[in-house]
Amino acid sequence: MLTLQRLSKRFGTHWALQELDLRVGPGEIQCLLGANGAGKTTTLNLLLGFLAPTAGAAYVNGIEVAANAVLARAQLAFVPERVSLYPLLTGLENLTYFTQLGGKELSSAQLRGYLDRVGLDASAVGERVDNYSKGMRQKVALAIALAKGARALLLDEPLSGLDPKAANEFCALVRDLANGGAAVLMVTHDLFRARELGGRLGIMHAGRLLINLAASEVSHTQLDQIYLDCMHDASAAQ
């Protein structure tokens, strides 16, 4: 479970995040939408313990991040926009390495099972990662998250640069993880697929959460208009 209580972050005189209240429970998907600089990635960095909050608190499964970042981070799986894998290792070797780094010893069959679960083609498992597409790299990153056993997943612009087929496959994997009980917080600019994922859609601007609605409450057209209205009203109020 991810819990944010009046979470705020200031850099000098600039408030990057202001009094964000949010809860993402097991099996739930929360998407954060907004322009660059809205505070979305700052939110992820606060949850990961990479930044210290100016005010408020972030919790991962009841662990306050600021008080024990290492323990809280161990409860999380994070897939950044640019996945960092060892390019000269294969997908299987990367999964093996990062799993062992996390203190887990899994058999080759178990590791291959995770790669199969995320849909990495069997013929690619033994190929070097520098030959992978971005979509294939994302699948390896998700396999690492699965093998880690984390119950909370943070995704930072995971759909950026993916072709439509790869983006749809990635979203299907995210839904499967949520259906399996994971709490998912995803930052994205893709309104269409954010709605398709289900869950909740939070629209942010200038560090504030303007609205947080259920995807089932709106059509794609309505979401587009709500997003534009929020951006217009927030800009006019500044």
Role assignments for model-derived ranges:
Residues 153-156:
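Catalytic Walker B motif of ABC-type/P-loop ATPase nucleotide-binding domains
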